[in-house]
C-alpha cells in the first residue's frame, strides 16, 4: 500500500521495497499523477513520487525564482533524504526536463534515466516563449485556480483515446497545485535548454514519446535521444502527452525492461 510522507521540505508518496525508483511529475501534475507506475513497479522496487517544490504538500524553493539548477539540487537532496546514494530516475514532461539536469549536474545520483513526453529544449518548433507563457498564465491572471481549468488543459494535451478514469486521476493531481506554484513553473519551463549539456549524460537512458503528442512531439524525442550517448527511443502508438496514464501498461513494461537491463549489466 502506498504511503504519503511529509518531509521537512519535500512531500512524497512511496510504495514497495528494493532499489529506489523516483518519479518526477510534469508541470500540471503532482505525486498522485503516477498511480499506475507506483502500483506496477512497487512489486520489485521501492518507488517514490514527489510533489515538486511548491506543489501539493512540498515547501517552495527558498529564495529567488524557480530554476532548473535549483530543482535538480532539490531532487538530489530528496534522493539523499530517502537514504539512497543513487536512484533510477523517471520523469515526464517538466519532470523529465529536471531529470536531464539532474543527470548532468548530479550524475552520482542517477543509476538510470527514463524520459517520458519531453524535450531537450523549449520551443524546438519555433514556439514563442512569450506567447506560450501568456496563454498559460491567462487563466491564473483571471483568478482561476488550476482545479477550475484542469479538465480543459488535460483534454487538450491528451491523445484521443484516454479513458475517463485516467483523466480523472490527472484532474485530481492538477487540483493539488496552487496558482502561485504553477506560475513559477511556467516561468521556469520557458528557460529550458539542455542541448549543450546532453552529451555529458552517462546514465543508460530510455526516451519514450506518444505518437500523437502535440506538446512534445516525436521529433523532439528524436533530437533528445540522439544527443544522449546511451539512449534508446520508443514511440508509443496512439498516445498523447499524458503518456504514463494513456498507455500505462506499455510504459510500465518498458520501464521494467529498462531497469532490468541496467541492473543485469
Predicted regions and their residues:
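Conserved alpha/beta-hydrolase catalytic His-Asp/Glu region
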Residues: 124-130, 143-199
Amino acid at each position: 500500500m502506498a504511503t504519503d510522507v511529509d518531509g521537512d521540505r519535500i512531500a512524497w508518496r512511496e510504495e514497495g521495497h528494493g532499489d529506489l525508483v523516483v518519479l518526477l511529475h510534469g508541470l500540471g501534475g503532482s505525486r498522485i499523477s503516477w498511480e499506475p507506475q507506483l502500483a506496477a513497479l512497487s512489486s520489485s522496487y521501492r518507488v517514490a513520487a514527489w510533489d515538486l517544490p511548491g506543489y501539493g504538500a512540498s515547501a517552495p524553493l527558498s529564495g529567488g525564482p524557480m530554476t532548473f539548477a535549483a530543482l535538480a539540487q532539490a531532487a538530489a537532496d530528496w534522493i539523499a533524504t530517502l537514504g539512497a546514494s543513487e536512484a533510477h530516475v523517471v520523469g515526464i514532461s517538466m519532470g523529465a526536463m529536471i531529470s536531464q539536469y539532474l543527470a548532468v549536474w548530479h550524475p552520482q545520483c542517477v543509476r538510470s534515466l527514463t524520459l517520458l513526453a519531453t524535450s531537450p529544449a523549449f520551443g524546438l518548433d519555433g514556439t514563442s516563449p512569450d506567447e506560450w507563457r501568456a496563454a498559460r498564465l491567462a487563466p491564473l491572471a483571471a483568478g482561476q485556480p488550476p482545479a477550475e481549468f484542469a479538465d480543459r488543459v488535460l483534454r487538450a494535451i491528451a491523445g484521443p483515446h484516454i479513458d475517463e478514469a485516467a483523466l480523472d486521476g490527472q484532474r485530481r493531481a492538477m487540483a493539488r497545485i496552487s496558482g502561485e506554484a504553477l506560475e513559477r513553473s511556467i516561468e521556469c519551463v520557458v528557460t529550458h535548454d539542455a542541448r549543450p549539456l546532453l552529451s555529458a549524460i552517462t546514465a543508460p537512458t530510455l526516451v519514450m514519446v506518444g505518437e500523437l503528442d502535440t506538446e512534445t512531439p516525436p521529433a523532439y524525442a528524436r533530437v533528445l535521444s540522439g544527443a544522449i550517448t546511451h539512449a534508446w527511443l520508443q514511440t508509443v502508438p496512439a498516445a498523447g502527452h499524458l503518456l504514463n496514464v494513456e498507455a500505462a501498461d506499455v510504459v510500465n513494461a518498458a520501464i521494467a525492461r529498462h531497469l532490468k537491463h541496467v541492473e543485469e549489466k
